[in-house]
Structures are given as structure tokens and as C-alpha cells.
Regions:
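FNR-like FAD-binding dehydrogenase module
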Residues: 1-418
Length: 418
């Protein structure tokens, strides 16, 4: 383990040169795979409009329903896990460029965005052409609700008022689904739309059918973090996450599961990052709500590569820990955090060092904030890794991922799309 200041700029050498301009442009955050998938859905709808024009009202309705169904179903937990299973089934002898692209599977939310926007546009066209009074009233009510959901899902509102975004998305989504049923029944569109709506409704309801309140044992090694332990009959796979709540109709928060090999149950590392996490750490509740199934997360893509580097800051160590413990893929850890033993406790730090004796741990309380792009690159180069996985805050994650990818190094990190 390295706890002293890492090597100087002279020792590390220069970062690799930037990719040529055309390739570098494709690595820009605005052209990330999430946005490409959203654009693909929108362009596919535009192509359909061009090829099928003019469109009859039933076709407009079917197009709206198909796109809105896409927006809902791609967020279903079983579908998400299927996406990851398919993408990570590629063997490591496949070309790196192919595996690099498959590793972006967690950008599937672009399909959600594209489907929601296209579906709303199709439904607007349908409503404008609807002559029926009651049907038109339901249509405009549904459009107003869809517009509210889309507006509050935009990053400026979602990032500042995430609790309100979550409530509007949940209750607005349920209300929109009820209105869609009403509209479909009034319009008499036949069995196919009803079958699609039934699938969408089941997709929405399924996680709530598994809603339950479970016991939790919580340790607080410092005022900054809580370690929550669960053992209610489920041992999740490494790289998955669990959503928990203290009030199921209000806020839900997802955290990376940390199962221990050979033991039942799992842990969550909960860092103080807002009112909800702060009250959880202060109160140490004995029971919380869970729903649905555990869902695959970004670090699951590690199996696509022969060696990976994990870059974490602060409580970002939580999502990395299950992969470090499972050791399915050779890995090297770079962890920057303030006073790790005082913040997270000796037991957790010793557990990390037992499986990562060569980890580079930068104590920010002693050495200040490091250049994480350079640290990530040095570990990638020295370890002979094929990819870097960064778990940190939004600003630093984008800085590391973009800083490496525009130099031709596969890099991955959360995209904060929910």
C-alpha cells in the first residue's frame, strides 16, 4: 500500500498524447453513448415518419405507445440485468474496441430518454388530430402530465431538487399510466395496445410486489459514514445495488452492495451526502424498506477486460469493494480519501488491504487533493490494465473518464441519469 505522497510529475512521465481530433470528438461527453442511444431512437422515429407519411390516427397511437413502452421497460430491473448479462458475455479475446463499446452498456438510459421524447411527440400529434371530446380531454391531460415529467427530469431541476423529481416521476408516471389505460379503452384500439399496456403495467408494478421492511444493523465508524449490514435471506452478486427507503412513497436511495465471499447477506457503505443520508447516519435506523431485486451497476463490466484499475474517492470505495473481494478480474486500486482509518474504521481498511496489498491510498487530509487523471493513468500503465473504472463524485468521474478516453484509454464511471 502507498500512503505517502505518490510519485512526482518527473517520476511519472507525461500522459499519453490526445487522440486525433475526429476520434477525440467522439469521446466528448456530449457524444457519450447515452446521448447516441437517445439520438438513435429519435432518428429511427423520424425515419419511420418519413417512410410512412401520411399517418392515420391508429398508427400515431401505436407509435406513441411503442415508444413510451420502451421508455418504461428499459428501466425495469430484470431488463437492466439482462442488458448487462448479454453485454458482459463477450470473451476477453475479442478485440479491445468491441469490448470497450460493450462496456458502455450502462448508458442504456439513452433508450429511456429517446423513447419518452418520441412517445410524447407522437401522442401530441395524435391528440391534435383527435375529434372526440372526452378522448381529447384525456389526451391533453396526459400530455400535460408527460410534459411535467420531462421538464422535471431535465438535469438542472433533477440535480437541484432530486427529491421532487423522484416524487413527480413516480406519482406522475403512475397517473400517466392510468390515463393511458383510459385513453386506450375509450379509443377502442384493439387487443395489441391493451397487451402492451398490460406488459408496461406489470413492469412498473413488479418491484413494488416485492416491497418489504427488513432489519438492518448499522455501524458508524465516523460522523461521515455508516456501514449498514443486511441479512434477510438474499445475498446479492458483486457489482449490484440495492435501493432502500425509510418511507417507501417518498425517497429511495441506491447503494452498492458489498457481499462477503462465503457469507450470507451484504453491506452498504452510506456516506453523508445530503439530508437523507445525513439523517440515516445520525439516526442509525433499525429497519428500512427494500423493493424489487438487486440491479447490476457500472463496475460489472470489469469481466470484459483482462485487468482493470479501480479509481475511487471517499465512499466511492463502496461500489469497488465487492469486486476487490471477489477478485474475479485482476485489479489495482487507487483510492483518494481523507484519513481512511479515522473515517471508515480499521476493520474496513484492513479488509481492503488484505486483498489489495499494492493499493495506492492517498490521504487527502495529509497530502491535499491529487491529480486523479495522472494517478489513474500511472496505475493503468504500471499494472498493464485494459480499462479504468472510476467511482467518485460527478465532476471528478467525468474528469477522469473523459481525460483518459480522449487519450485512447477505455474508462468507465457513473453518468447520473436517474
Amino acid at each position: 500500500m502507498t500512503t505517502s505522497p505518490p510519485r512526482t510529475h518527473q517520476d511519472t512521465g507525461e500522459l499519453p498524447p490526445l487522440l486525433p481530433a475526429p476520434r477525440r470528438l467522439l469521446k466528448h461527453p456530449r457524444l457519450m453513448h447515452y446521448n447516441r442511444l437517445a439520438a438513435l431512437v429519435l432518428l429511427s422515429n423520424a425515419a419511420f415518419l418519413w417512410a410512412a407519411w401520411p399517418l392515420a390516427a391508429p398508427t400515431l397511437g401505436h407509435a406513441a405507445l411503442a415508444n413510451l413502452a420502451l421508455a418504461v421497460v428499459v428501466r425495469q430491473q430484470y431488463v437492466i440485468n439482462l442488458f448487462f448479462r448479454l453485454a458482459t458475455s463477450a470473451p476477453t479475446h475479442w478485440p479491445l474496441k468491441v469490448r470497450w463499446t460493450l462496456g458502455k452498456v450502462y448508458h442504456f438510459g439513452g433508450l429511456h430518454v429517446g423513447g419518452a421524447l418520441a412517445g410524447t411527440a407522437w401522442f401530441l400529434a395524435l391528440t391534435i388530430t383527435t375529434p372526440n371530446g372526452p378522448l381529447m380531454a384525456v389526451g391533453w391531460a396526459l400530455l400535460a402530465l408527460l410534459a411535467l415529467i420531462i421538464a422535471t427530469a431535465l438535469p438542472p431541476f433533477r440535480s437541484r431538487r432530486h427529491d421532487h423529481f423522484e416524487k413527480i416521476h413516480r406519482f406522475g408516471g403512475w397517473s400517466a399510466l392510468a390515463l393511458f389505460w383510459t385513453h386506450t379503452l375509450l379509443s377502442g384500439q384493439g387487443p395489441v395496445p391493451l397487451a402492451v399496456l398490460a406488459v408496461v403495467t406489470f413492469s412498473v408494478a413488479l418491484p413494488w410486489l416485492r416491497l418489504r421492511k427488513v432489519d438492518v444493523r448499522t455501524e458508524r465508524p465516523s460522523p461521515h459514514v455508516a456501514l449498514a449490514r443486511f441479512d434477510y435471506g438474499e445475498t446479492p452478486f458483486a457489482g449490484s445495488s440495492t435501493a432502500i427507503s425509510r418511507s417507501p412513497l417518498k425517497e429511495w436511495h441506491s447503494f452498492a452492495n458489498v457481499p462477503a465471499p462465503g457469507r450470507s447477506g451484504f453491506r452498504l457503505t452510506i456516506s453523508r451526502a445530503g439530508d437523507w443520508t445525513g439523517s440515516f447516519i445520525d439516526d442509525l435506523p433499525e429497519r428500512v424498506w427494500v423493493k424489487g431485486i438487486t440491479t447490476a451497476g457500472v463496475a460489472n463490466i470489469e469481466v470484459l477486460f483482462k485487468k482493470v484499475v479501480y479509481v475511487a474517492t471517499g465512499s466511492g470505495i463502496g461500489p469497488c469493494l465487492p469486486h476487490l473481494l471477489a477478485a474475479e478480474v485482476p485489479s489495482r486500486l487507487v483510492w483518494a480519501t481523507r484519513d481512511p482509518r479515522a473515517t471508515y474504521g480499521d476493520a474496513l481498511v484492513d479488509e481492503i488491504l488484505a486483498v489489495q496489498p499494492h493499493a495506492q491510498v492517498w490521504d487527502t487530509s495529509r497530502h491535499g487533493k491529487p491529480d486523479m487523471v495522472r494517478l489513474a493513468h500511472d496505475a493503468y500503465r504500471d499494472f498493464g490494465a485494459e480499462a479504468v473504472i472510476c467511482i467518485s463524485n460527478k465532476r471528478l468521474t467525468w474528469q477522469v473518464v473523459h481525460g483518459l478516453e480522449r487519450r485512447g484509454i477505455p474508462a468507465y464511471g457513473a453518468i447520473w441519469d436517474s
